[in-house]
Amino acid sequence: MKQSISLQIIFLFFVFQFSFINAQNKFDTPYGNNDSVGKYVEINGVKIYFEDYGKGEPLLLIHGCGADIKSMANQIDYFKNKFRVIVADSRGQGKSELKTDSLTYNQITNDWEGLVNYLKLDSINILGWSDGGIIGLKMGIRKRTKIKK
């Protein structure tokens, strides 16, 4: 009984925190749903949705598991004045298709490398959150793309 009540309190705390954070993050730009800069591209047999903001050195923003472009809104808003920010919904998340029974880091890494190739980017900077950090590390280890930072 005590454990059940504790779990309920923890759950309510996280729901409250999430609601509070979302209430604070209101932007003029509808990140993750911006028809003026968003588009779909077919990569590795799936439609991947991405948005492209700003000018300058390319910066890939890669969200974590269960998230989407909207979860990177603060970062997009900050970096778009200094970099060309490219942000996508990873396979099976947000507006991007899944088209598989299982999902692996290798598959997601292949998709991000495919997006870099599609955009014909010579060198990139990467900022990844959680699983996005793992994808960025895998891209660096593979050395198929020139990564600055």
Where are these regions (language model features)?
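N-terminal non-catalytic accessory region
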Residues: 26-35, 39-40, 58, 65, ...
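Alpha/beta-hydrolase fold catalytic core
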Residues: 2-59, 82-83
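Conserved HGGG/HGGXW glycine-rich cap/lid loop of the alpha/beta-hydrolase fold
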Residues: 46-95
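Short, well-ordered coil/turn elements that cap or connect secondary structure elements
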Residues: 35, 80-82, 121, 144-145
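Active-site loop/oxyanion-hole signature of alpha/beta-hydrolase fold enzymes
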Residues: 87-127
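Conserved hydrolase catalytic core segment
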Residues: 122-149
